[in-house]
Amino acid sequence: MGARNSVLRGKKADELERIRLRPGGKKKYRLKHIVWAANKLDRFGLAESLLESKEGCQKILTVLDPMVPTGSENLKSLFNTVCVIWCIHAEEKVKDTEGAKQIVRRHLVAETGTAEKMPSTSRPTAPSSEKGGNYPVQHVGGNYTHIPLSPRTLNAWVKLVEEKKFGAEVVPGFQALSEGCTPYDINQMLNCVGDHQAAMQIIREIINEEAAEWDVQHPIPGPLPAGQLREPRGSDIAGTTSTVEEQIQWMFRPQNPVPVGNIYRRWIQIGLQKCVRMYNPTNILDIKQGPKEPFQSYVDRFYKSLRAEQTDPAVKNWMTQTLLVQNANPDCKLVLKGLGMNPTLEEMLTACQGVGGPGQKARLMAEALKEVIGPAPIPFAAAQQRKAFKCWNCGKEGHSARQCRAPRRQGCWKCGKPGHIMTNCPDRQAGFLRTGPLGKEAPQLPRGPSSAGADTNSTPSGSSSGSTGEIYAAREKTERAERETIQGSDRGLTAPRAGGDTIQGATNRGLAAPQFSLWKRPVVTAYIEGQPVEVLLDTGADDSIVAGIELGNNYSPKIVGGIGGFINTKEYKNVEIEVLNKKVRATIMTGDTPINIFGRNILTALGMSLNLPVAKVEPIKIMLKPGKDGPKLRQWPLTKEKIEALKEICEKMEKEGQLEEAPPTNPYNTPTFAIKKKDKNKWRMLIDFRELNKVTQDFTEIQLGIPHPAGLAKKRRITVLDVGDAYFSIPLHEDFRPYTAFTLPSVNNAEPGKRYIYKVLPQGWKGSPAIFQHTMRQVLEPFRKANKDVIIIQYMDDILIASDRTDLEHDRVVLQLKELLNGLGFSTPDEKFQKDPPYHWMGYELWPTKWKLQKIQLPQKEIWTVNDIQKLVGVLNWAAQLYPGIKTKHLCRLIRGKMTLTEEVQWTELAEAELEENRIILSQEQEGHYYQEEKELEATVQKDQENQWTYKIHQEEKILKVGKYAKVKNTHTNGIRLLAQVVQKIGKEALVIWGRIPKFHLPVEREIWEQWWDNYWQVTWIPDWDFVSTPPLVRLAFNLVGDPIPGAETFYTDGSCNRQSKEGKAGYVTDRGKDKVKKLEQTTNQQAELEAFAMALTDSGPKVNIIVDSQYVMGISASQPTESESKIVNQIIEEMIKKEAIYVAWVPAHKGIGGNQEVDHLVSQGIRQVLFLEKIEPAQEEHEKYHSNVKELSHKFGIPNLVARQIVNSCAQCQQKGEAIHGQVNAELGTWQMDCTHLEGKIIIVAVHVASGFIEAEVIPQESGRQTALFLLKLASRWPITHLHTDNGANFTSQEVKMVAWWIGIEQSFGVPYNPQSQGVVEAMNHHLKNQISRIREQANTIETIVLMAIHCMNFKRRGGIGDMTPSERLINMITTEQEIQFLQAKNSKLKDFRVYFREGRDQLWKGPGELLWKGEGAVLVKVGTDIKIIPRRKAKIIRDYGGRQEMDSGSHLEGAREDGEMA
């Protein structure tokens, strides 16, 4: 510190404090800036003593000046500070830092010529002379010479690494020290680092990767002329295969210089940043202030982590402004928010200096006392005198008691009293409030009879003075009273028992002592000499002080010091105090205090103490199923990264008591693995408990559904809280714990795996939900009984408390519940505690008088997939409980059939209209109301034109909830049946939510309802209801009879269809010899059956018996449909209405039943057969002649794609193997080419899908890597892209584009040198694009608009090429075809696992095996050698080919694999 203190003295120090940091700013230089600058000089190998003179500062500036343009912010701040110190030494008058810099520049140029302007680029440019800068390469006499790095520089680098251990400061330090260095110099710096070889290895790996990437991007152009300097390779840049002379020539040659030094520095910086992240794994988002942590300590940790973050300054600025306040503890956050927007760091540190734990408060108290007692502070640290040592033994200054040679004095060295030593001295105890004579006025104040002064720890008797024996006697009495506890409350809490010296006397052992929850301030009413006072019980205060009472004139004046300052008080002794019906006598002070406080002197006299109640949740006994044993599955291998993550998780859980180590006698094991969480930064441990779930006894879900806000009674106050770590708070029964054992393996089996068992409910185990629900019910049941007027709704870990109590009483109940849960080991996080509306609960927003759904925003998309529609329908169904009129019928029709989740959906006009109507409905906010038991509950049902039923459940005009019903299970339905289903749904819903049946308002006439209900009462359950008729439904009835009609004609109907040609027949035969057949086209089996039934109805009389063999037709007729979406069913309904009586019966098909057998033969002739078998031989001949492709064969001959592909695969001429022919363009589905072109002074970036010719383009502001990367991200978010081909432009080879390509998973390739056609597709498309723009240029003003218009024309208005399609159609067709091919290949791979043995003709010998190609209804396709044969099914045996058995473990123990015998 000597050099630092002597840098500036006297007037120079005063002059420093007049200079502003910034022009026009408020802040000025302080002595701390000099100290900081002296510390920083050591990093650059510069002595601190250089700051003491003008010449020394000039030497420092000579070293720092060349590094300023490319240096870090710390380097620039150091340079600025030295400039100011130089000006003070030179007696130059300056006002701010900028003025000092200008003067220094001017003087250095005039005197030494060394402060010339630095280059604006980061590429090293050697100065013009030896004195030109701190460069290893100097320009002397027109030649560049290399000067090795000085030992001082190397020493500074080594010291930086050793001190900071690869902290965040290493990267800017390396940048500053290696400025202008060659690869040789940089390697010399790396070789100086002796330790940290792991970090050095990481840097070497980065160098190897970057060198290989350099070689790929910069291929060797070819042979060079003799004497010409070769181009550098990656190893040359790394300095392993190049000399210093070659490196200097590459760096400073006139034509195309290659800054190998800067390139190598960038590689090293990438490696150093990786090491910094490894050595500093703490994320800045995890830096949070502890509850008692001083704010300054938290800020230090925050900025240390911030320096390790490799991000933009703008992002760091945002982190500083947002995260610093957001992650502070609640006390500091409250203080910081009061400072307004964007406070400075100095303001925040000043405001929060009083917030912290006891240690922080003690330090601040000491500082406050020092300012009051001690002499006035001297302005500068250099002028302050060191405090003299004083010996406690002899009283002399200059040495300590340990060094004292005088005889040892008996008694305490602190207070001088005998009977105890200094470590036990009561005067050493520090308190939050302390009394005693302070400052200069203290001797003038009246003193008490004791010469020892005020007692800071009053004894229970209230005496502030006395002998040592009395003090110890009182202390022992108090401690003994604290140790004697009594049993309190039914949860086993303990409370202190008072000592026997109180007026009231000792309490009985059977009584429970008072308890104070710490969720709010412990404030009680005390009576001081009969005067009531509200006081705070403060265990952190030594003494007691109150305001607003009069206790007479028998007092002693005292000064009390605290965080808030110092106040004058009156001290009264032996005052009678009554608290909670208990009386004591103690010392108390009165004064102007902001809050009345009872400190430890009164609390100990009352026998109070702090107690931590520990309650217990009894575990539930669980058994395995009879005859079952626990899982004994092997742990599969895991990656090293996952093993380390699991170890960290398990160690944390073991410390928290959730896991314990399994004994070696435990035979059970369950596989464990890890997955990344959503933020991709943390890991989640998963245990595969499927096998344990199989053998564990069954459980019943106690909670059958989710509570609904419409079922809540209307209450004045609501509070919502959450139970944290729900499962991990409940113990698992000890007898069951061994079955949960799992193992953490080690890499390469380096050590035995560590085994754990669960002590709490595991996640993923089937018993955890039921046990948690049962436990929560047991925990809350006594609380519910004790507070019957309070509503407590609990679903899993969400708890809602509602009551009509006053605010104080309601808050008290909530705090009691939190205390109960916390006492049982459950946590209730403050961040999820909701005290004020709106309350976010179970997806709802709750208010005291109403409830809403949380904000619903329907997405806006250009392209919708099946998964998007599913999510949309789910959101709309959720909204339908409050928003009347929500419809999803046509939206659901968009995803009918077998569709993949990612398949694009084609919208219909009806669906678009339905979605827009729903958007309008959701834009009008709706409110639901709470249930009032005394009012009538009503349900009104309505039906719209589209057969959708809506209902609302209300009390008078207040709607509780609404709903819709559109579950039409069949295409053909009956309105009365649907109405019954609606009533059933409402009835069940009302019973669950309110426990009562509402009064219904239904749109049907009573007579029609009762007529239908008499026949179909068994269809479903309908609750009792009061009938209120609204405008009725129209109901059509037809007379179906239950027995055959004697004398009526009987019709046997049947229909058939060929699946391939879609041709079919429908017909009937009668018992009177009539028959009729009708040919059908583009039909199905079901449609043919319905046609036959309709023909029978049309051709029969008023009474008829119809026999069908189709359950489909039978079901439709029996349900008496009144409406249908099918034209043929509507025709059947019309015909059935005309009949007087109809009897419909069903018989099984193909069973030889008379009538049915005849009509079956009638309609099956020429229809039910395999139509494509006879087309295989012509297809083979066609391919042998013309070598047609798969699509042509399938299209022309109507054979399946799989058969056509097998024909092509069997042709030797049509198979191409090996690599693609050199020079051909890669036309795979995911291949795109990208290039930039120019038009009208604008830059247009163009991307072309090679296979289809589809084009994407837009105008970008500059041809940079960032803009190119953004365009690539847009492209990849719209279309599948796996391979990107570009030229070698700087924007395409930039780090931004590489990073995007890596993140998306794109293979990137570049143009081949001397082959401009390697990206010829996009080059040609640039030409076509410009031609198209020229044709339509008049239609738009800006080039941005006309580019997009031209793209539309080229993608959608240009047909031709492959398939005679537009590029957009071709691209979509290719994507769809690729999906179909993948499906067929998967199907084909399954068929290849089977072998066929067959017989041909009359030959009884079995032949084969052959390869199964196709399995039809009547025959199979078999490949034998090169022949494809058609074998009838009756002459073929299909056997699975399992291959040869392998003598090895059949179970797969790889990560994620399933074991047939062990896992479901």
From Swiss-Prot:
Residues 279-365 are annotated as: Dimerization/Multimerization of capsid protein p24. The record marks W1012, W1025 as: Essential for RT p66/p51 heterodimerization. Its cofactor is Mg(2+). Residues 514-518, 562-568, 601-613 are annotated as: Dimerization of protease. Mg(2+) 1 binds at D722, D797, D798. Residues 656-846 form the Reverse transcriptase domain. Residues 533-602 form the Peptidase A2 domain. GO terms for cellular component: host cell; host cell nucleus; host cell plasma membrane; host multivesicular body; membrane; viral nucleocapsid; virion membrane. One of its GO terms (molecular function) is structural molecule activity. The record marks G222, P223 as: Cis/trans isomerization of proline peptide bond. This is Gag-Pol polyprotein. It comes from Human immunodeficiency virus type 2 subtype A (isolate ROD).
